[in-house]
């Protein structure tokens, strides 16, 4: 049995402070979700979640421990609404499985959970077991990226998936014809999740390299980066070094109203050629100058 502390009505400027306190109190896991559509939020270090209504879930092994933390948080920030819920082991570990169903992107790409048969066996099927910490393709930014990849000509192309998470974009690119993909992330859990999903899809080392971003050296035909605005801006020069003139950069992970900021920030190194929107999120396509 586990005990989940659900924290609502948390001011955005307090989220980082409260998550740090939860870590100090010994929370086994901390998850941030958007109250409106419940995507998993994977913020870069030092960044603050963008959504106006963020829910924090913290998991504890003992009810008394969770109750103590609840009391301490409310005493310090009275506006917080904290509720406590017991979770059976199976519910904590795989509660999301019931909601993860096969999804189609474009005309031929399916993302399917590893525990269900693909609806169209002859289609391009990506079998995914994302684990607890990473997305499944349901969030708008991942959906935008998968749909773009499905229609792109990736045959014999080299690709960098920057901020690979579960590896969903890396594996999709390989399934759709990419010759080699470099999946990079600053989170070791993400690298392990990508490795596990590559194994489930019979992807070999000749097709996929998994590493931290520092290992990137060779120029590629395409970079796809589904990360937040601040790291996207800070990585402009790095991306430009890895992309020869005319090569493509695809970015997502940014809100619709943030798109002009990124376009302006990239103007000296990249030409903006296309934009797609979905549920308030944007995907931007650039070519390297």
Swiss-Prot record:
Could you tell me which Gene3D superfamilies the record lists for this protein?
Vaccinia Virus protein VP39
Annotated Gene Ontology cellular components are: cytosol
Q: Does the keyword Transferase apply?
A: yes
Enzyme Commission (EC) number: 2.1.1.-
Give the reaction(s) catalysed: L-lysyl-[protein] + 3 S-adenosyl-L-methionine = N(6),N(6),N(6)-trimethyl-L-lysyl-[protein] + 3 S-adenosyl-L-homocysteine + 3 H(+)
Which GO terms of the molecular function aspect are on file? protein-lysine N-methyltransferase activity
What is any one GO biological process for this UniProt entry? Answer: methylation
> Which residues bind S-adenosyl-L-methionine per the record?
142, 163, 185, 226
Which family, according to UniProt? Belongs to the methyltransferase superfamily. PrmA family.
**Protein name (database record):** Ribosomal protein L11 methyltransferase
Organism source for this protein? Legionella pneumophila (strain Corby)
Q: What is the lineage of its organism?
A: Bacteria, Pseudomonadati, Pseudomonadota, Gammaproteobacteria, Legionellales
Gene from which the chain derives? prmA
